[in-house]
């Protein structure tokens, strides 16, 4: 990485000044009412190095709805619980179709392509539900153990909106059940899934929570962690499947494993160096933050950092 840490504060300010003119290019997620009401003119960014040094700019400490970024933490927890047995129920390939496709799920006998599309994430949540007395609390505690912030919780208003508008997710869960790949009760699994997607965290929380993915599974906040080289496996899935239908273009433009959510957040890691989280609510047509993607592209450009 061609940059001294002492130069990072100035670089982050430069990135901030270069991305904020993009306000208005995208739009907030209008199909989840609480997200549509978020002030769109916000941007935050936080970087955490594997030695614990942190740098931030903008609204890096502002909590927001992490949405599909929660699928990353649910995956890590499910793998912590059942290990490679999870892959008997969900694949590890890009889908090539919409993240909430029913057609692909039925054509492939109820085995979702990967854990980041909705069908795969629901199977992951089902795994947690079937191994936990209180699955939502267990996930909250797991995420708190990664971020060091015990106040990360789901947002009740967002949860209610998710549940009221989640018709397609209900269809996916029922199809999974019909095809024999949902062990729990549909309503119970969906309730946990909606609460999971409604979790709130800040950029700083997310950068800390993904530190282990940049540091060979080692976390500053958690003494025991997931299995051998979990970071390698999860990072591979983020690179190929982490940004909906734009994963290939993001790998080309940015060159880091990453996971996004329609709340406007993106987490990314440069293994051996740092984890980074960005947030800005306005999305492109693929559901990814316009300013967030540009900020990460500028970061890797100015620091000559990439996994490639």
UniProtKB/Swiss-Prot annotation:
InterPro entries documented for this protein: Beta-lactam/transpept-like, Glutaminase
Keyword line: Hydrolase
Positions contributing to substrate binding: 68, 118, 162, 169, 193, 244, 262
HAMAP family associated with the record: Glutaminase
Organism: Hahella chejuensis (strain KCTC 2396)
Gene3D superfamilies, per database record: DD-peptidase/beta-lactamase superfamily
Top-level taxon in the UniProt lineage: Bacteria
Catalysed transformations (reactions): L-glutamine + H2O = L-glutamate + NH4(+)
Stored Pfam families: Glutaminase
Top-level EC class: hydrolase
Subunit details: Homotetramer.
GO BP term (any one): glutamate biosynthetic process
Similarity field: Belongs to the glutaminase family.
EC number: 3.5.1.2
SUPFAM superfamilies in alphabetical order: beta-lactamase/transpeptidase-like (SSF56601)
GO molecular function: glutaminase activity
Name this protein carries in UniProt: Glutaminase
């Amino acid at each position: 990485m061609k940059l001294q840490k002492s130069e990072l504060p100035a670089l982050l300010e430069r990135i901030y000044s270069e991305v904020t003119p993009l306000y208005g290019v995208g739009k907030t997620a209008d199909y989840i009412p609480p997200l549509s009401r978020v002030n769109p003119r916000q941007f935050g960014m936080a970087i955490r190095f594997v030695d614990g040094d942190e740098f931030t700019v903008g609204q890096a400490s502002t909590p927001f709805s992490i949405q599909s970024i929660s699928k990353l933490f649910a995956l890590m927890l499910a793998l912590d619980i059942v290990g490679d047995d999870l892959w008997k129920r969900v694949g590890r390939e890009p889908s090539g179709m919409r993240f909430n496709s029913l057609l692909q799920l039925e054509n492939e006998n109820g085995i979702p392509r990967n854990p980041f599309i909705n069908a795969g994430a629901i199977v992951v949540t089902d795994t947690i539900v079937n191994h936990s007395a209180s699955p939502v609390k267990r996930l909250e505690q797991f995420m708190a153990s990664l971020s060091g912030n015990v106040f990360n919780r789901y947002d009740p208003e967002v949860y209610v909106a998710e549940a009221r508008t989640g018709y397609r997710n209900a269809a996916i869960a029922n199809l999974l059940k019909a095809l024999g790949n949902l062990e729990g009760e549909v309503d119970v699994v969906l309730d946990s899934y909606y609460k999971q997607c409604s979790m709130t965290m800040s950029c700083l929380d997310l950068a800390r929570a993904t530190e282990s993915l940049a540091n060979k599974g080692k976390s500053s906040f958690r003494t025991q962690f997931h299995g051998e080289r979990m970071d390698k496996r999860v990072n591979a899935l983020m690179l190929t499947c982490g940004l909906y239908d734009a994963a290939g273009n993001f790998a080309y433009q940015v060159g880091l494993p990453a996971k996004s959510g329609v709340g406007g957040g993106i987490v990314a890691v440069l293994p051996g160096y740092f984890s980074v989280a960005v947030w800005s609510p306005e999305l492109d047509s693929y559901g990814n933050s316009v300013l967030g993607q540009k900020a990460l592209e500028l970061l890797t450009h100015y620091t000559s950092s990439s996994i490639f």
